[in-house]
């Protein structure tokens, strides 16, 4: 009897430890997750295995300071896709055909507003799609870097939450610390990755978005307190990776998804 009790106690403690470990490793629920859209039936039907990442935005053109970071972010997106079993064609395969089509239909981007003429965009994409059939591509992936706005919470812990991520404030410049009168409710610029996936019929099969990082920091040189553009934009690779995972969920499953399953 004592041996049985010891065994039972051991199994109970082991089970409890495993449960606590599982709970501690689970992502904290974040209500700010983006409401993704996925056509699962079409995804299953298309059996997407080979993709190409477009060098252009699907929506409004990114801000200049984000556009400069786009090739680096696309490279990380490509690596993530390959890790998950996808074949990623070189971006130049898309870019060369896109540029040729632009010469026929004109640039769909209005330089004065940054908005995209969807009629021209559709004509160009139809041409690109037709010319890329022999490459074996199954889907086109658009990766738009968006500038949004968020604010830090009040209280003892100041964090900003948007598109599934939680970020702490960063400081920039010499100073003695954040003023006690600093307005934590002031809006600051943040960046997110928006992913849109279209199949060979140019039907959208997935749309998602994941937060990346704040693109502004607290200016320590300001006595009143203000935000300034960060010198290094999206330099934290861990934050970028998190945003990529969130942007692709559930097209690519992730244990780090902080929303409801």
Give the positions of each predicted feature.
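Short alpha-helical segments and helix-capping/turn motifs at coil-helix boundaries
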Residues: 6, 35-38, 125-128
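Bacterial N-terminal signal peptides that target proteins for export
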Residues: 2-12
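Bacterial N-terminal signal peptides
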Residues: 10-21
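C-terminal/domain-edge helix-coil "capping" segments
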Residues: 23-49, 147-261
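Alpha-helix termination/capping residues and helix-transition junctions
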Residues: 17, 45, 134-137
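Charge-rich, low-complexity terminal tails
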Residues: 56-60, 71, 253-261
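N-terminal segment of the mature soluble domain
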Residues: 60-150, 192, 198, 202-207
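Acidic/histidine-rich, surface-exposed loop or edge segments in extracytoplasmic proteins
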Residues: 47-63, 106-107, 227-228
């Amino acid at each position: 009897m004592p041996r049985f009790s010891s065994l039972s106690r051991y199994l109970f403690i082991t089970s409890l430890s495993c449960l606590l470990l599982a709970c501690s490793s689970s992502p904290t629920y974040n209500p700010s997750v983006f409401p993704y859209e996925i056509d699962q039936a079409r995804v299953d039907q298309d059996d997407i295995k080979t993709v190409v990442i477009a060098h252009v935005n699907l929506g409004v053109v990114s801000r200049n300071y984000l556009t400069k970071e786009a090739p680096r972010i696309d490279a990380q997106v490509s690596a993530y896709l390959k890790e998950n079993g996808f074949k990623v064609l070189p971006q130049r395969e898309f870019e060369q055909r896109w540029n040729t089509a632009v010469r026929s239909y004109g640039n769909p981007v209005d330089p004065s507003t940054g908005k995209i003429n969807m009629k021209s965009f559709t004509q160009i994409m139809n041409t690109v799609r037709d010319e890329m059939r022999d490459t074996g591509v199954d889907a086109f992936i658009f990766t738009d870097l968006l500038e949004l706005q968020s604010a830090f919470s009040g209280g003892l812990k100041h964090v900003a939450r948007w598109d599934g991520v939680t970020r702490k404030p960063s400081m920039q410049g010499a100073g003695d610390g954040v003023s006690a009168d600093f307005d934590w409710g002031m809006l600051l610029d943040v960046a997110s990755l928006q992913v849109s996936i279209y199949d060979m019929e140019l039907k959208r099969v997935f749309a998602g978005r994941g937060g990346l990082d704040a693109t502004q920091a607290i200016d320590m040189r300001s006595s009143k307190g203000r935000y300034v553009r960060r010198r290094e934009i999206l330099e934290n690779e861990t934050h970028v990776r998190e945003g990529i995972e969130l942007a692709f969920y559930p097209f690519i499953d992730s244990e780090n998804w902080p929303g409801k399953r």
